[in-house]
Amino acid sequence: MRKLYCVLLLSAFEFTYMINFGRGQNYWEHPYQKSDVYHPINEHREHPKEYQYPLHQEHTYQQEDSGEDENTLQHAYPIDHEGAEPAPQEQNLFSSIEIVERSNYMGNPWTEYMAKYDIEEVHGSGIRVDLGEDAEVAGTQYRLPSGKCPVFGKGIIIENSNTTFLTPVATGNQYLKDGGFAFPPTEPLMSPMTLDEMRHFYKDNKYVKNLDELTLCSRHAGNMIPDNDKNSNYKYPAVYDDKDKKCHILYIAAQENNGPRYCNKDESKRNSMFCFRPAKDISFQNYTYLSKNVVDNWEKVCPRKNLQNAKFGLWVDGNCEDIPHVNEFSAIDLFECNKLVFELSASDQPKQYEQHLTDYEKIKEGFKNKNASMIKSAFLPTGAFKADRYKSHGKGYNWGNYNTETQKCEIFNVKPTCLINNSSYIATTALSHPIEVEHNFPCSLYKNEIMKEIERESKRIKLNDNDDEGNKKIIAPRIFISDDKDSLKCPCDPEIVSNSTCNFFVCKCVERRAEVTSNNEVVVKEEYKDEYADIPEHKPTYDKMKIIIASSAAVAVLATILMVYLYKRKGNAEKYDKMDEPQHYGKSNSRNDEMLDPEASFWGEEKRASHTTPVLMEKPYY
């Protein structure tokens, strides 16, 4: 057995060595045979044929002091590694022993920072009207809110009424228009519930007790059972009042109902269906609209505050550029701009409804008799039953740039990929709070990314290059803006960016390989398309090294696991005869092993055979 272990271990190490270094191959004789692909800063394929290297080779450009002007620098020629005539100077800001090349990888240093502003991805549902999922209640399918991010400042306006939407729905002898949208009183009282009351209520539930107030409110609302249907995946939405620290469960999931066919704005007709619409009103600025799917790490992955001194833009080969096509509206302040963005944002509102929704008497009787089956076709939500079920999946005009000087709100529907530092602008989204602002623009982002990429490429060069001349080679990333002009490795003197609170410099003498089209799409320029056609997703080739290292580690881990398994198997075989009593078989070691998976049932995941009844706690229901 020990011999088998040794053989397996040696085989694993041999395989790892072959992956990294090959078998019998001398890489030092061909240091550039499989090196990464880099083109010089200003190479335009204008060289003579003998100087046109294929994409998957690396060229070296020798820097030397030169009196040539910038136009001369536009036509640098490569040298080979056997002492061919050196190329003209590509840049003039560094020492003569420094060889600077420009990467051809068009990466975006903002990718991680801007992830929370990819609303289609992080929210995944409507914003103005959120009806992104379907759920069954008492045998019938209905729609319900499903956005993964909180919507700050969102509320419901009931037309021609002094009743707020957080008023409990009308019951008993109340007129229909005397009620609002909130859950009716229950025993014990489930809505509204203060933050302290919720903390106390869930103090023994380890899955809930430590959640933040918004996520806790969302989970609390999702704990209510609709129509006594314990098998239903339907979860009520909620609104959290940050000022009063209260969680209001919404009995009505509908967010918009307009038109004479479906509602009546006449205040005198107290028992007619009221008209309502979603809005970001000044009276709602402390409210946050929550669906059942609000993620517990929303503070990291969802936008909340607006960005001062910032303007959403598109990353275009080394710099953040303006979004060319926007819809411009007048707005006296940030609140008005945020409100406009919300009104134009993604919406799941149905476009057609059923005729039977005009049967006000049926709805009225449903409220009086607390008969959910009479009103659910209207309020779970309006137009959901046998109507079109349009789902936006978060696509819409969800972003805006507010110009504080011109008082213009620029709204667009393309996902921004970077931020422009501009003291005249505030960047906002439909999810964001209508007035809250953060001032911390990440000024050092560019410099940090440049240094990180240069260091990463330096390590790669040390592994693959055999430079005996002592020259220091630098692979500069395609980032042409920074608050440290020396970090740009620019062949000319960088220019100062105007209206920048970060004192940015931009390098403009390096030709850009991408551009923005009139429909807000970033594309590779025509003359460079052939070069990038062979590079999947434009990923840098140093990722291949990561894959090799990961593969090597995986082989070693698998070998270790196999050895442990064989050892345990041998031990178990020796103990097999001792396990002859039936009570030792199939018996769980702890109560936890006998419980159903709580998260799948309690948090409303896809219904499965063993996940139809919650096991963490008794769900209160009305």
UniProtKB/Swiss-Prot annotation:
Residue ranges crossing the lipid bilayer per the database entry: 547-567
Bias (Basic and acidic residues) ranges: 578-594
A GO biological-process term: adhesion of symbiont to host cell
Record membrane topology: Single-pass type I membrane protein
Subcellular location(s) of the protein: Membrane
Keyword GTP-binding among UniProt keywords: no
Positions of glycan attachment: 162, 286, 371, 421-422, 499
Keyword rRNA-binding appears in the UniProt entry: no
Span list, region Disordered: 578-607
Disulfide bridge positions per record: 149-302, 217-247, 263-275, 320-418, 337-409, 443-502, 490-507, 492-509
Major subcellular location class: membrane
Pfam families: AMA-1
Spans within the Extracellular topological domain: 25-546
Keywords, ordered alphabetically: Disulfide bond, Glycoprotein, Malaria, Membrane, Signal, Transmembrane, Transmembrane helix
An example Gene Ontology CC term for this record: membrane
InterPro entries: Apmem_Ag1 (IPR003298), Apmem_Ag1_dom_sf (IPR024056)
Signal sequence region: 1-24
Cytoplasmic side: 568-622
Function according to Swiss-Prot or TrEMBL: Involved in parasite invasion of erythrocytes.
Record-stated family: Belongs to the apicomplexan parasites AMA1 family.
Protein name as it appears in the record: Apical membrane antigen 1
Organism of provenance: Plasmodium falciparum (isolate FC27 / Papua New Guinea)
Gene this protein is translated from: AMA-1
